[in-house]
Design a protein with these regions (language model features):
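Short, low-complexity N-terminal intrinsically disordered segments enriched in polar/charged residues
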Residues: 1-30, 128-130
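A solvent-exposed, acidic/Ser-Thr-rich amphipathic alpha-helical stretch
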Residues: 22-23, 29-77
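Short, flexible active-site loop motifs that bind/organize anionic cofactors or intermediates
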Residues: 11-14, 42, 62, 112
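A beta-strand edge to alpha-helix "cap/lid" segment located at domain peripheries
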Residues: 1, 53-130
Length: 130
């Protein structure tokens, strides 16, 4: 049996992979803040559901996108995810390992922190014209 917070995060990852913004939006607090480390064009703090959905939509501009969850650890208020994402933009291909910490309250996501392993490589990759 998995922790209910892991179930919620896995549901969100599935919705992200299928582009289901309705499911994603329904699981986010209206005052969510999503922190993305680094210097790539999508880095920074994204406040509110519309801004978070726009941030997540940046990955729509990749081909052959995949997301592999390595492990998840959960408590009653947080889920920590170790994962690897890869994709292609034009002729450029990139694989990014990252840690994500998701904070939950009352069954919705209130805050997220992304920590990318290769921030410089991600910045170069996300700057490739599409």
């Amino acid at each position: 049996m998995t922790h209910p917070n892991i179930d919620l995060v896995m549901k969100l990852y599935g919705a992200f992979m299928t582009g289901d913004d309705e499911t994603i939006g329904s699981a986010l607090s209206p005052d969510i803040t999503w922190h993305s480390s680094g210097t790539d064009p999508t880095a920074g703090d994204h406040h509110g559901i519309p801004a978070v959905l726009a941030y997540l939509g940046a990955d729509d501009h990749m081909d052959d996108y995949s997301l592999d969850v390595v492990d998840m650890l959960a408590s009653d208020t947080r889920v920590a995810i170790i994962a690897k994402a890869s994709g292609r933009r034009g002729d450029a291909r990139f694989t990014n390992e990252f840690v994500q910490v998701v904070e939950l309250r009352d069954g919705v996501v209130t805050e997220v922190w992304n920590y990318n392993w290769d921030q410089a490589g991600l910045a170069d990759f996300m700057s490739v014209p599409i």
